[in-house]
Amino acid sequence: MEGLQPVRSLFTRFFQLEAASGLLLIAAAVLALIINNSPLSYLYGGLLEVPVAVQVGALNIAKPLLLWINDGLMALFFLLIGLEVKREVVDGHLSKPSQVILPATAAVGGMVVPALIYWFINRDNPAAVAGWAIPTATDIAFALGVLALLGKRVPVSLKLFLMTLAIIDDLGAIIVIALFYSGTLSSVSLLLAAACLLVLVAMNRLGVIKLGPYMIVGLILWVCVLKSGVHATLAGVALAFCIPLRTRNAESSPLLALEHALHPWVAYAILPIFAFANAGVSLAGMTVDSFTHPVPMGITIGLLLGKTVGVFGLTWVAVKLRLAALPAGAGWGQILGVAILCGIGFTMSLFVGSLAFAPGSSEYAGMDRMGILTGSFFAAVIGYAVTAMASRKTSIA
């Protein structure tokens, strides 16, 4: 049991960080909206378009600041997701099939139903259909943060259900990005990336436990993936899967150490910076028609209704078919509340939206953000209210 203590303390720290960072994410998004709809809007747009170049010998990477944030900083976010997924699969809640069935089933429903709703609303517009994956994402920071506001009124099992569901949802998002949002591929860069991956695997098998060598090869891997046409953030996931969880010295774990070190940076810096850079929607000239356009409407309905129906519906099916049981101490009202909270797409939806509708090159770049912010806001408010009412009834009973 003592060996599980680091994992338990890490989960406690993780939940506290994600809950606290939710308020910072909201503040960053609101600040972006205020600045971009004020006389200072030119500063906001100008800042994100500032060219940043890095050159090492013949290698030159030049991008506007916005893309450095989306391709660079978010690679660290996906590195953290990869570490969490590996830990859960090897030694956590995803290591036991009986514990995976319910959240995995719910996660599948929470991705498929929103995608179908968005596709149905935008089916006559091929350019708009490219955003089908936007409402399939769940922002783990916001969802857990809202649930944390209820404190001890919700059972720990319900929090674990939401966390596991969100991690599986993130894994699904990674697969979607790899399969559907990669550009023209460069065979040379892909071969170099594969070589880096082989080196990382070899280091793992040879028992290398120092994080420094992994980070150096990981940086080279990121550059190769960036140049390959596959989205660069996937390099973070690949690197994470190669970091060893266990060592011959049972008291140390490179994976847990890196995860522990990354959490505050991701929670309090990377995600708020990303939110600030991507949530600045211009409200100038916005009318009711702006919200009823198929793109924002598809995203809003997909997040709010699609996530609820998908997560709650497949959870109900799994329980009724006796494939799994409800989380201990949780009632159906609380499951409904959590299903609604899964509609908080925010950062993950904004990220997928930046791939589907690239800022500056797609007419839907601003529309998708309107749908994401609207759907996420109502999902947070309604989800909190439903979960709070259901928890009160459960505690009274």
Swiss-Prot record:
Its main location: membrane. Keywords: Antiport, Cell inner membrane, Cell membrane, Ion transport, Membrane, Sodium, Sodium transport, Transmembrane, Transmembrane helix, Transport. GO terms for biological process: regulation of pH. The keyword Transmembrane helix applies. One of its GO terms (cellular component) is plasma membrane. InterPro entries: Na/H_antiporter_dom_sf (IPR023171), NhaA (IPR004670). GO terms for molecular function: sodium:proton antiporter activity. The keyword Chaperone does not apply. Coiled coil: none annotated. Pfam families: Na_H_antiport_1. It catalyses: Na(+)(in) + 2 H(+)(out) = Na(+)(out) + 2 H(+)(in). It is found in: Cell inner membrane. The chain crosses the membrane at residues 15-35, 42-62, 65-85, 101-121, 129-149, 160-180, 183-203, 219-241, 265-285, 299-319, 335-355, 370-390. It is a multi-pass membrane protein. Na(+)/H(+) antiporter that extrudes sodium in exchange for external protons. Belongs to the NhaA Na(+)/H(+) (TC 2.A.33) antiporter family. This is Na(+)/H(+) antiporter NhaA 1. It comes from Pseudomonas putida (strain ATCC 47054 / DSM 6125 / CFBP 8728 / NCIMB 11950 / KT2440). The gene is nhaA1.
